[in-house]
Amino acid sequence: MKYTYHLTIPYQDVDASRRIRLYTLENYLLNVAGKTADQMGIGIPTLLPMNYTWIITHLNLEMLYLPKHNEEIIVETWIERNAHMLSVRDFRIYQSQQDGSQQLIGCAKTVWAVLDLTTREIVNIFDHEMFDGSVDGEVLNMARAARLRPIQLDNLEDDTEALQAGEV
């Protein structure tokens, strides 16, 4: 099932160019995900009595346009799949046009897990009844997020000799 939210960009959420700040847009998506989970009966108010909470493990966002102050965006969201203790939630972001149409300006993919607050371990609760019928199944075609390679710290002590005071 898909859920849709209409949001107007307030002045405090834009930067000096009057466009929405990227981290603010990401917060919008997280808030929409939380509201949707609450409406589906799988939100934090449902999970906390079981001593569980949602955590986000990945967020991949692609934008063609960053909306400006006072522009309306429409965020459409759905659960792509629940598998292997992870839930994949997708988003499409549209900009409202003056003629009433909507233009696709971005998309996002998030990956979530449920954390046991006592053991601090990720748990599989997707076989519970509360998750029946929550998956829409539509796959959002997005490029996979790049993986960052770990920084090699070998021979770090040797490299520090080249630094002078005040260079860092």
What are these regions (language model features)?
Residues M1-V168:
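Terminal targeting signals and extreme-terminal segments of soluble enzymes
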